[in-house]
Curated annotation (Swiss-Prot):
Heme binds at residue 100. It holds the Pfam family Globin. One of its GO terms (molecular function) is oxygen binding. SUPFAM superfamilies: Globin-like. The lineage of its organism: Eukaryota, Metazoa, Spiralia, Lophotrochozoa, Platyhelminthes. It comes from Isoparorchis hypselobagri. The keyword Protein transport does not apply. InterPro entries: Globin, Globin-like_sf, Globin/Proto, Globin_trematode, Mb-like_M. PROSITE patterns: GLOBIN. This is Globin.
Amino acid sequence: MVLTKDEFDSLLHELDPKIDTEEHRMELGLGAYTELFAAHPEYIKKFSRLQEATPANVMAQDGAKYYAKTLINDLVELLKASTDEATLNTAIARTATKDHKPRNVSGAEFQTGEPIFIKYFSHVLTTPANQAFMEKLLTKIFTGVAGQL
């Protein structure tokens, strides 16, 4: 178990207004990808729906909106699995196989996103405890996925 039930409940309670609709999930995901692509514009070409995008226009692309929703949908699935180690490990394996292996992302490349996403979510979340819970979850996810790439 990565998160206790109380940690999960607290984190979900704070995140809920940001993940309660597809529009909110897209906005949250766009923010995360804005930070990732600012730090690593070379990653844009790893996404099949962003092949024509440039760093200047990537976030306006329909593909970016698609990936933003997908990112947060996957994160919510991983969060929901976070109180059971076996379920979380299965979900991590699924995201590695489904989303990252087909893009030829190396474990080292994937790991570069960890501090970016931790920083992003530390700004999204206002409660220090929830920031710590999210960091713990993201560290588990990034380490787990990178280990399978």
